[in-house]
Each structure stands twice: as C-alpha cells, then as structure tokens.
Amino acid sequence: MPREIITLNVGQCGNQLGSEFFKKICSEHGILPDGSLSTNEFIDDRKDVFFYQADDQRYVPRSINIDLEPRVLDSIRTSEWSNFYNPENFIIPTNNGAGNSWANGYYTTEKMSEIEEIIDREVEHCDSLEGFFFCHSICGGTGSGLGSKIMEMISEKYPKNILTSFSVMVKENPDVVVSPYNSILTLRRLITECQSVVVFDNSALADITHTQFGVDEATVFDMNSIISSSMSAFTANLRFPSTLYNSLNSLMIHLCPSRFSHFLMTSYTPLRQVNQISSRTSAIDVMKRLIQPQNIMARTRLKEGKYISMCDFFQGDVSYDEINEALQRFTDRRLAEFVPWNKEAIKVVHTRVSPLVKRGNRMSGMLLANNTSIRYYFQDILKAFDQMFKKRVYLESYREQFHDNFQEFEESKEIVKCVIEEYAKAESIEYSDYSYPIHKYLKGIAKEKIAE
C-alpha cells in the first residue's frame, strides 16, 4: 500500500525546482503534460505516492505552489504543463513579494489561512499520508521567511508525518545582500521543524555543471536538472518499491539517528547526456565516485568530517552480488571514515528503474549521507551573519517587523551553534553520553514564551 507525499514548492527557487522534479518523475511514470498516460503498457509502479487520479482519470500532482511574486507561477500556468497542476493549489500573490527579506515573508499573514486550507484539503485526499516534501531556497524572502512559517504550521498540525526539506543554500557571493540574515533565521526552522534536510549549494552545483557538461556558466535549469535527478533517485524506492527502504520513515531511521543533526548531503553519478556514450562501469567505481568531494552537491570540508550514516542507491543493470561485493571492498579498503559509535553506518540499495526512460549508462548511483563536515558549512554561514549583524547593516525590514527586538536573531544563532557542537561531538565514541544542549536551550525558549 503506497503512502502519499505532498510536495510544497515555496518561492521562486522552490517552484522552479519542484516543477523540474515533477517533469522528471512524470517521464518515469509515463505521464504527459496534460496528466494523461503516454502508454497503456502495464508498469509496476506506485503513482499514488506523488499523484492522484481526478474524475476524468488524469493524474494530478500532490503539489502546492506558493509564491509572493507572480512571475514563476505565471510561467508554469502558461506552459505546456498548465493543465497538469490543480489550479486551486496555486497561491496567487496580492503584493509585491517579500523584497528578499525573511521578516517580510514570515509575517505575510494574509495568505496563511488559505495555505493551511489547501494543505488540509490535500491531506484529506490521502489514504495514508507519510509526509511532506518542501522545496525552497533559504536565501531569498519567500522561500526562507514564508517557508519558515509554513514549516512551523506543518510541524505543529501534522507532528506524526515526516517533513523533508530540499533546501538550496548560497554560501559564496550571494545575489541577495541579506542572505546571511535570511539563512540563519531559516536554519533555525530547518533544525527544529524538519525530520530531514537535503542540502544543495549553488556553488557546488555550478562546479558540477561545468565539470560534467562543459558549461561555462550554469543556468537555473542546469542546476535544477541535477537536483531533480537526485530527488528522482531518492524517491525511486517509494515509487518503484523493492524490499528495502520503501518508505521515508525506514530511510530516515537509518540516516538521521539524532533528532536535530539531520542534514544530508547528496551526490549522483553519472550525470551525462542520454546521447553520450559512456564506458562500462562497476558498482565499486560508482561508490567511489559518490564520495568524491567534487561530486557532493554541497561544498564542505568533507575530508575533515566523518560519516554518521550513508546510503547508496543503485539503479540499472547491476546484480545484488556485484553490489554486495562492492560494499565489502569499500569497507575493507576503508574508503570512507565513519563515526566510531555507529556500526551499521552504511547501507546499499538496488532500486528498480522505469522501463519508459532511455538510459545512457549501465548503472547509476545516488548517495544520501549524514556527514559531520556539514558543521563547517554552518560555521561559514554563522561567520557571515556575525560580520553583518555586528555592523547593524541592512536591518530596516527586520527592525520594522521585529519592532527593534532582535532576539529572534540571537536565538537562531544559538540553535545553529548547538547543532554545530552536536556534529563535532558526534565524531567521538563519547557521543552516546552527549547531553544535547539544544534540548535545554529550546525548553528555555518555550518557558520564556509561556511566561510572556
């Protein structure tokens, strides 16, 4: 019995990414832009995870598209996919957007009741909801601010369902000058409201695009295409189920053993055009490529960290014997360094592939990993925030919405610092006795709010 997942695409980046993801999985399930099927051929899949059938038998995505600026939503509604989405699930903006400010996005309250109503309606359409996917950027105003508000609402209203975020971050040369403010405030919600967060970094995606496709300057389409390939592989076992990790819950139990250190890195190989000819590769080659720093979709000091957990997903013409042999060689050679307290840190999964999609290679692989080096990424964001906040620059919209009280910044900073510390402690054998200061800090904040 499939368990459904509702996808929320928030902000410009989130809607562009969500659109590419659905195009990708539509091709795998034989769903055309109007929601009809491209073939009557039987496919042993679970379309119901991300789609439902309307009265006219068309497949409609369990997708909610939200933005405070009309451009991206209008481009979707006027494209060849205009009849694919449920028109009632578009949140049409009535103002000029969030102005790249987290505070403006977070305090845009006039749309929250409409958003909540749409989410409730989609939940009612599900027989057994497993969770929510959340696509957004943490740097702009809508994806970060309004996105944070929506995450809080989902976490409070549906605490038993998994909230997984696909978060695009910018650490180097951000286009949005207040990105450090937006990022630190959003990281707080990603820590406290989500059960897992898959991190994507624009600079890493641009480098991968240049290396794999020879593109001098990566476009949004190029980067979203890479992310959607990863998301497709991530969800393959949910949509084409096998015997292992065919639910979000089973996967998260392995990847995120701690409540708050749930930030995941990903890589995908090979990223080649369909018409490119590639040499025959092996499972061990795929496993080695997946952990190469240049293939990870977030730039961290990977060699200075340790893996808390990892899961390799194989697709294509590869046997279980070859996969198990590759796993044995991988562990015997100690090709990756793991934390000392997790003896079951690495898992491998063979996922089925759609018979409708032409493949340009014998096999492909996708990595999902929880690595302690992510703390260095957060440290860089924290450093950028401190440099700006100490100067008290670009605070106009935040000062207005926060009424000159910047406690929100201070609390967010402390929560991020707690997670950085937790990832550092996770590298030692004493981690099992760790006291988790973030729990104490969050309880303190809760008591203060009750007192108010």
Swiss-Prot record:
Disruption phenotype: RNAi-mediated knockdown results in a severe disorganization of microtubules in the nucleus and impaired cell growth. SUPFAM superfamilies: Tubulin C-terminal domain-like (SSF55307), Tubulin nucleotide-binding domain-like (SSF52490). GO terms for cellular component: centrosome; cytoplasm; gamma-tubulin ring complex; microtubule; nucleus; spindle. GO terms for biological process: cytoplasmic microtubule organization; meiotic spindle organization; microtubule cytoskeleton organization; microtubule nucleation; mitotic cell cycle; mitotic sister chromatid segregation; mitotic spindle organization. Keywords: Cytoplasm, Cytoskeleton, GTP-binding, Microtubule, Nucleotide-binding, Nucleus. Belongs to the tubulin family. This is Tubulin gamma chain. The gene is G-TUB.
